[in-house]
Amino acid sequence: GGGWNGWNGLGGGWNGLGVGWSRLDGGYGGGCGSYGGEGIGNVGVADELPVGGVTAVGGRVPIIGGVEYGGPARAAGAVSICGHCAPTCGCGRAGLGGYY
């Protein structure tokens, strides 16, 4: 697929170009306001983004602009996005609750 490094080969996601994760909505970027969705400014990581445990997002993460990584993004535990096009939470626009 055309996703982020062909993530699971399921779609264009992450940049809003395809159906993305499990084809629930616009994908890991295409729908639900997208991963570059709502707000102001950019999120830039110039080096490393280490996650040693679990990063949980229980509400909304509004971002507008670019999400850019200049180095590796490493997750030693689990990185879960619940409510943003995840099969267990879904997307508001897909009628599954979640992000909206």
UniProtKB/Swiss-Prot annotation:
> Segment Right arm: which positions?
82-100
- The superkingdom of the source organism is Eukaryota
Entry keyword Chaperone: no
**Region entry Left arm: which residue ranges?**
1-33
Tell me which UniProt keywords the record has, alphabetically.
Repeat
In this chain, the stretch annotated as Central domain covers 34-81
Keyword Glycoprotein on entry: no
Q: Indicate the family of this protein.
A: Belongs to the chorion protein family.
Q: What does this protein do?
A: This protein is one of many from the eggshell of the silk moth.
Q: What is this protein called?
A: Chorion class A protein M2774
Q: Which organism's genome codes for this protein?
A: Bombyx mori
Native organism taxonomy: Eukaryota, Metazoa, Ecdysozoa, Arthropoda, Hexapoda
